[in-house]
Amino acid sequence: MLDLGLSKMALIGVVALVVLGPERLPRVARTAGALFGRAQRYINDVKSEVSREIELDALRTMKTDFESAARNVETTIHDNLREHEKELNDTWHSAVGGLNEGSVDAGTYGSDTPAAPSWRGSTAALARKRRNWRVKQAAMPVWYKRATTRRTHVQSGAARVARHQPASLRRPTRFL
C-alpha cells in the first residue's frame, strides 16, 4: 500500500504535534485511526465480494458446461436407442412378414411416421389397468395409513407415557 517506515511516521507525528498541539492530537489520532480502520474493512469487503463473484461466475460456467455435456449425452443415448429400436422393429416386421396386413398396426409398419414400439402392448391391456386402479389404491398397508393419516386425538408425550404405564409403576395420588 504505502511505503511508510518508522522514520516517516515519526516525522508525521512531530509535524502533527506542532500543528495540532498536545490537547487536540489524541482526539485527531483516534479519529484518524477509526477512519483508517473503516477504510481497511471496506477494502477487504470489496475484495471478498469481487472474489466471491469470480467464484460464482466460474461455478456458473462449470454448471452450463456440465448441463450441455449432459444434454449431449442424453441426445446421443436417445438417438442410439431410437436407431436400435428401429432396427429391432424392422427385424421383427420382416420376421413376421408372412402375416396378413390386418394383424399389424397400420401406424407402426409401412408409414412415414415414427414407429410405435412393439413392446408397449395393446390398448386393451391398458384399458384393463385403468379400470382396476381402485384395487391398487385399496391395498395400502395399515401401518402406513396409521403413520400418514391426520391425528384427531393428540396427546402430549407425558400423557402417552402415563396412559401406557402399568398401574404398579404409577405414583400414588395424594390430595391432602
Swiss-Prot record:
GO cellular component entries: TAT protein transport complex
Name of this protein: Sec-independent protein translocase protein TatB
Membrane topology: Single-pass membrane protein
Keyword Cell inner membrane on entry: yes
Organism of derivation: Burkholderia ambifaria (strain ATCC BAA-244 / DSM 16087 / CCUG 44356 / LMG 19182 / AMMD)
Highest classification ranks of the organism: Bacteria, Pseudomonadati, Pseudomonadota, Betaproteobacteria, Burkholderiales
Pfam families associated with the record: TatA_B_E
GO biological process: protein transport by the Tat complex
PANTHER family, alphabetized: SEC-INDEPENDENT PROTEIN TRANSLOCASE PROTEIN TATA, CHLOROPLASTIC (PTHR33162:SF1)
InterPro entries cross-referenced by the UniProt entry: TatA/B/E, TatB
